[in-house]
Amino acid sequence: MSIKSDRWIRRAAEAGMIEPFEPGQVRTAGGNRIVSYGTSSYGYDVRCADEFKIFTNINSTIVDPKQFDEKSFVDFKGDVCIIPPNSFALARTVEYFRIPRSVLTICLGKSTYARCGIIVNVTPLEPEWEGHVTLEFSNTTPLPAKIYAGEGCAQMLFLESDEVCETSYRDRGGKYQGQRGVTLPRT
């Protein structure tokens, strides 16, 4: 497997792999500095959309991935999401992805957030998976933390295999195939 360059990412985006797509790095908006997004040397920095689900313990439920209670979250829509101390929020990417059959995509958090104690977690985007990426933000600090919608939040790295997989995510009918919006756990 080899990591793919900015040139490859641009060609794949022309074929519909990332929509909407930014061919370069965007670092300012309206004359203000922002957390960068767009194509980098060997990756693509995604943006966070303005839809969030913030963890709450108002209902004092137990978190169970097999029987997840939607009441564990408070829905929020806005330009800035404030995650409570030592808490968690879900969001989604602005970008919609269509991963080629020979590609596995790994997501890493951006250092701007990591250096503030905000960790972004996303599982790999498997071959032939498509959808909005659900982003998991953990605020590891004892203070409230801000996440900015419309700005960069994580980087996607594209790894292409020299051999196409036997069974893709689409072939096996993956439960998150075609997801739109912030998607909660499914079993």
UniProtKB/Swiss-Prot annotation:
The keyword Hydrolase applies. Transmembrane segments: none annotated. It catalyses: dCTP + H2O + H(+) = dUTP + NH4(+). The gene is dcd. GO terms for biological process: dUMP biosynthetic process; dUTP biosynthetic process; nucleobase-containing small molecule interconversion. It comes from Bordetella parapertussis (strain 12822 / ATCC BAA-587 / NCTC 13253). It comes from the Bacteria. Keywords: Hydrolase, Nucleotide metabolism, Nucleotide-binding. This is dCTP deaminase.
